A protein has these predicted regions:
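Phosphate- and other anionic-substrate recognition elements at nucleic-acid/protein interfaces
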Residues: 1-158
């Protein structure tokens, strides 16, 4: 299983993906998601922020801070850039959110309804990006531009 995260400055979307269907998903305040990750025994992948040479505001830095906080709650955090997700799911670096959403629906089926749940039931808004990260991380052992953060082992006391 893979937990995919679409990080935000105060709240982040997450999806737990088992390779065939969404097991759990939600939007949580960042501190609550970090606590949730403490008990996660799955692989964790997070969309990584990329610089395109443009000025950024406070929200971008708060989002990067949240990703750092998440990294402190897991043994290994895969940081998957959006461009790698686009290339994997749509075979184009120019894909937009709608293209990614459609690629996921084409591959796995409709979201469905409460009475007739599809494999992507519960996915909406930022959870689409979290699902895209989870599927990419599940499918590929590594991507071209990703980084990995490992928590260092504590040094023995002297």
């Amino acid at each position: 299983m893979v937990i995919g995260i679409d990080p935000g400055p105060r709240e982040s979307a997450f999806v737990v993906w088992d390779g065939e269907r969404v097991v759990a998903s939600g939007d949580l305040p960042n501190q609550e998601l970090a606590t949730y990750l403490d008990s996660a025994c799955s692989s964790v992948a997070c969309e990584w922020i990329e610089s395109f040479g443009m000025a950024v505001g406070r929200e971008v830095f708060e989002t990067v801070f949240a990703v750092g906080m998440f990294s402190q709650h897991v043994d290994r955090l895969r940081l998957v850039p959006r461009r790698d997700v686009k290339l994997h799911l749509c075979q184009s670096p120019r894909a937009k959110d709608g293209n990614i959403r459609q690629a996921l629906i084409d591959r796995f089926g409709e979201v469905g309804t409460k009475k007739n749940r599809g494999p992507l039931f519960g996915i909406s808004q930022h959870r689409w990006a979290a699902l895209a990260v989870a599927v990419t991380a599940f499918d590929l052992p590594t991507t071209d531009h990703e980084a990995t953060f490992h928590m260092p082992e504590p040094e023995p006391a002297a």
